[in-house]
């Protein structure tokens, strides 16, 4: 397996359908998906797996996603990992203020997700730098 195909993207969500859809997209790209439930210790897993990016589902009054974002961004190691925050609500200002590197409002198309990864990582879904 070459170096590019080993790059991992952690998908942390509370909704299994959210994780399933993003895993499908990631499988068709140069990355490998690491699905994680928000109830799990996302911070420890991020330290262990060292993904190139984390996609984090947050949802309004649910504090789990926001708490996870703050924990990730305050950690000396995991804080360097770029995070895309996804929510059904228009909370982009909050997401960016809390430390997210990008914000996507759901629902979004695969193309929008791919464009966000390209912008965030400086490479397209095939792992080629731009």
Where does each model-flagged region fall?
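Two-component/phosphorelay signaling modules centered on CheY-like receiver
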Residues: 15-35
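Acidic, metal-coordinating helix/loop segments flanking the phosphotransfer/catalytic sites
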Residues: 37-53
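Conserved phosphotransfer cores of two-component systems
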Residues: 47-49, 72-80, 98, 119
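Conserved phosphotransfer microenvironments
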Residues: 56-74
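Alpha4 helix (beta4-alpha4-beta5 surface) of REC/receiver domains from two-component response regulators
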Residues: 63-67, 88-106, 115
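A short, hydrophobic beta-strand element within the central beta-sheet of small alpha/beta folds
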Residues: 79-90
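Receiver (REC) domain switch/active-site region of two-component response regulators
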Residues: 108-109, 118
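The C-terminal output helix
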Residues: 118-130
